[in-house]
């Protein structure tokens, strides 16, 4: 009889813990963080002459993988160190979520590359069912490009051993 009670007690405890996990999963809160920079050499990555951008606008958009419908959208503006933070409530396991550049505060550095190979957005995973323990999601840095590269760019590219790459 004692063995049977222990089994029932164990099963009951597991059920309670399972329900607590389900209740907690419904309360997913994430924070998406990232930064925006000015790509002063027009090469799609940061260099020592890149500058951070205060006042740049980005948007986070999630779309359902199968239906393609928008399930979440939010915008944020970068602070004085070029960083943004977007609070997100909910779990978007069945979605593709991306950060995109929207608006630059600098008319000299406001182009977004539309080349096929260029990084036009930063994907983030907004689900607690992916093995990430933290609720903070870090997006890759995104950059607006200057209309013309800085005169220092050929030297910068040479320092990086990128002799065949030309700042365009």
Curated annotation (Swiss-Prot):
GO cellular component: extracellular space
Signal sequence range: 1-26
Tissue specificity note: Expressed in pollen.
Keyword annotations from UniProtKB, A to Z: Allergen, Disulfide bond, Glycoprotein, Secreted, Signal
InterPro entries assigned: Allergen_Ole_e_I_CS, Pollen_Ole_e1_allergen
Highest taxon of the lineage: Eukaryota
The keyword Glycoprotein belongs to this UniProt entry's keyword annotation: yes
Subcellular location(s) of the protein: Secreted
Disulfide bond entries: 38-109, 41-153, 62-97
Glycosylation sites: 64
Main localization (coarse): secreted
Annotated PANTHER family: F28N24.16 PROTEIN, PROTEIN DOWNSTREAM OF FLC-RELATED
Family: Belongs to the Ole e I family.
This protein's name: Pollen allergen Cro s 1
Species of provenance: Crocus sativus (Saffron)
């Amino acid at each position: 009889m004692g063995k049977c009670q222990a089994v029932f007690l164990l099963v009951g405890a597991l059920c309670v813990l399972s329900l607590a996990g389900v209740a907690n999963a419904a309360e997913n809160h994430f924070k998406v963080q990232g930064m925006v920079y000015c790509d002063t050499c027009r090469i799609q990555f940061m260099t020592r002459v890149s500058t951070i951008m205060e006042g740049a606008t980005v948007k986070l958009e999630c779309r359902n993988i199968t239906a393609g419908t928008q399930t979440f959208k939010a915008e944020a503006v970068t602070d004085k160190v070029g960083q943004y933070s977007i609070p997100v409530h909910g779990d978007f396991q069945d979605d593709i979520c991306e950060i995109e550049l929207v608006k630059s505060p600098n008319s000299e550095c406001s182009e977004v590359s539309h080349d096929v190979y260029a990084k036009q957005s930063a994907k983030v995973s907004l689900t607690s069912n992916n093995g990430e323990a933290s609720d903070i999601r870090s997006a890759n840095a995104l950059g607006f490009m200057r209309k013309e590269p800085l005169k220092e760019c050929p030297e910068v590219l040479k320092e990086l051993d990128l002799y065949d790459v030309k700042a365009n």
